[in-house]
């Protein structure tokens, strides 16, 4: 019933792929970094380069859709993601703070695109997520990590960042791992009396290093 709609969406999405294999939020091949040197371009927002998290969303859909016509786009997108992986195994997150968000996004995309989840890049990402799990079983990351990646740790765990980490680990085949068990226990213990999760943190970047938003649904949806 929805086949034609899905086909049109997939074709349009594949057409938004940039030359380097990645996908951006709004534009194609908008990578002219010299534009950010224009006076008063203090947000660094005159370009829209491909990012790991947006690419992951697009590749996840195209991989799940699974049509042969889009396999080259999936291959190029996965290649982009592998090139973008940080030295510590994480991926940068443009639209959610930060490395936890980006790493979850890519791991889930890899699984949806039917990639080998034993790939070295995947295992490195898993090890990074496990390495930043907090003593209480949760995960947390502050916006300071946009200033210095070494600061990718919050003074407290958050429900939605814990959920991101868990989704990433489970996509990578870690469902029965001790890290996942501890993370789920944290979420159960952090549930409020109204049976939801409440978080005060502003962890949705408008422009990284400039300003951040708070999406009230994050802690409830994820």
Identify the meaning behind each predicted range:
Residues 1-222:
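Preference for long, amphipathic alpha-helical scaffolds in soluble/luminal domains
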């Amino acid at each position: 019933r929805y086949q034609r709609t899905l086909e049109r969406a997939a074709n349009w999405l594949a057409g938004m792929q940039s030359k380097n294999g990645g996908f951006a939020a709004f534009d194609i091949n908008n990578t002219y970094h010299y534009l950010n040197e224009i006076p008063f371009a203090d947000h660094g927002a005159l370009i829209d380069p491909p990012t790991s998290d947006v690419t992951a969303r697009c590749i996840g859909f195209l991989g799940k859709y699974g049509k042969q016509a889009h396999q080259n786009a999936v291959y190029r997108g996965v290649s982009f993601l592998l090139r973008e992986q940080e030295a510590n195994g994480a991926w940068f997150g443009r639209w959610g703070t930060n490395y936890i968000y980006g790493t979850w996004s890519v791991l889930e995309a890899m699984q949806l695109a039917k990639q080998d989840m034993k790939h070295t890049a995947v295992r490195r990402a898993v090890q990074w997520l496990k390495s930043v799990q907090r003593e209480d079983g949760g995960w947390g990351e502050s916006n300071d990590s946009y200033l210095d990646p070494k600061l990718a740790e919050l003074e407290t765990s958050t429900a939605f960042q814990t959920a991101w980490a868990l989704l990433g680990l489970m996509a990578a085949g870690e469902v029965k791992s001790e890290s996942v068990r501890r993370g789920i226990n944290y979420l159960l213990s952090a549930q409020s009396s109204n049976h939801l999760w409440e978080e005060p943190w502003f962890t949705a970047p408008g422009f990284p290093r400039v300003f951040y938003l708070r999406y009230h649904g994050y802690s409830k949806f994820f």
